[in-house]
Amino acid sequence: MLTFNFKKYDLNKEGSMLDVGCGEGRHIFGVMQEFPMMKCIGLDMDNDSLQKAEEGYAYFESISDAGAEFMKGSAYSLPFSDNTFDLIVCSEVLEHLHEYNDAVIEINRVLKPGGKFYASVPASW
C-alpha cells in the first residue's frame, strides 16, 4: 500500500525520484508503475530491507524505462549533488531520527528548485 497517490500531483514524469528510508521499495515500485520514465533511487540503512528491495526490483524492472537502484545511506548525509531530485519521498522515517530537522535540511539540499517533497509520519508523532 502506498502512502501517497502520486497520480494526483503535478510531477515531472521524466525526472528523478529519491525515497529516503525506502525499506523494501514500495514507493519506488509504485512510481515505476505510474511514471516509467522517472529514474528512481531508494536509500536505506537496513541491509535486509535493501536486499528485499533488490529482489522486488527484479519483478518490476520490466515496467520501467528509466530503472531504479537501491543503496545504503543515511538521511543525514545524502550522497548526491545539490538540486538533484524532482521528487523526494520520506515515509514513516522522520519519527525514527533523533535530529530529524538535520535530515530535512539535507533532503532540501538535494531537492531541485520547484521539486516536490512528500513526508508522512504517524499521527501520534
Describe each model-derived feature in a short phrase.
Residues 1-3:
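Conserved SAM-binding loop and adjacent beta-strand
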